[in-house]
Amino acid sequence: MKFFLVIGGTGVMGTSAIRAIREHFDQNSVIIANWYGKESPGFQIEGADNTIFGDINDLSCREQIKSFNNGIFEYMFYATALGDVGIPIKDATQEQIDRSNKLSFNPIPQLENELDITTIVAYSTFYTIRHQLSTYGAMGHSKENIEKWTVASDGTTNHACIRAGLFESPSSRGIKLLLRKTSKNLDNLKDPLLRSYFENTPSSEGIKKFEEGIFKEEKEAYGDCRTDKEDLMRAHLELFKSDNPIFVNVCGKKIWPSKEPLLLKQFI
């Protein structure tokens, strides 16, 4: 019997991981899924055998997790994140980066130390494309930390990362909302690429043009775009089938492996 841990089990990536586990592994697999937000008594995450509500930074939440199978898990999927977005990555302050890392990165090595996990899967994006460099803010630094961690395994626990193209998520919606608000005064948009989408254009139309710009850049760089839930699930299945994968990239229908992290110093 294999135990699987999903942190952030209600999000797009978390639900994709759960679906992929159910499809790939046998029915005796046990999934423990964690979520945090506005508490809903009795809520159970679909596809999970046990649901744990709580902030992963709280000791009581981690102790609950450890109570399952003595803290021994075949896989952990770390699918939660929170950080300041809507500003250029290069403009994020250290305070903003630290705040983003608190949930988006720091718990990963902490859980690696506290639990007995065979493989940890984290998540990233193509944050070095021009559109992401101009809007991904502090989250870009947290994702870089994840990518550096992915290639730094000491062999005790396997590290893997699914790097995905733009898909609809709380983070992408947050960026669009912040851009809509910021664009009301064009002086707030210092980045010339961003500014070009909103000049002499209603903010709602500017957001659409911005999103189309991301899709166009992704397609030019990686061969496809418009990543959806099915694509994300297929990326997980590809990871399960691979022999010691490092990065599994997914952009639209295209999925491919790679070994090198994206380093911001080459772009900012």
Task: List each language-model region with its residue ranges.
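Conserved mid-core segment of classical short-chain dehydrogenase/reductases
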Residues: 81-98
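C-terminal helical subdomain
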Residues: 159-161, 180-265
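N-terminal Rossmann NAD(P)H-binding glycine-rich loop of SDR-like oxidoreductase domains
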Residues: 5-26
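NAD(P)-cofactor binding segment of oxidoreductase domains
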Residues: 62-68, 94-118
